[in-house]
Amino acid sequence: YKELRYNPLLVKINYTRYWLETLWLTNNNFDKYISKNMEVVNHDNIKKLKKQYPGLIFALPHMGNWEFAIPAGNNINLDLLAVAEPLSNNYVLNWFKKLRESLGIEIIIGGKGQNTFNTLEEKLISGKDICLLSDRSVNKSGVAVEFFSNIASFPRGPVALSIKTGVPIVPTAMI
């Protein structure tokens, strides 16, 4: 395999692209455009699972612009909810929260003292479909896992929520 090298310019280009895409999301045609140019793979399996469980747990990686999952979920009648990590700038946090909720996804702000796990359990049982970024732990409670020959910290939340509720985890990615 080809060894990947860190390229600061590419990081800046990708970050700029993310912000431009995020600003573009405020365009009213966003949902139609994304839906027209997106293919949801295995949506029949998701529909079968929805008949068996009130809500589902979708495990997503930090890959692409995950707001694009909103029209995909809308197309197959999912009632989406996601957890956002708190930001130090409340103005930016509230702007992102309002933007995402205007696109059709409920946002819960996680963090210390928020009782996020119990809230997610209640929402899941009541029929919400939960999108959780699952490729990195944002606090010290993650599980150490060997990942590409290195030790990485992954969040416990998706697995713990699945075990407690009996709801399956649906690995999800957008490419």
Where is each model-derived feature located?
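Soluble catalytic domains of membrane acyltransferases
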Residues: 26-175
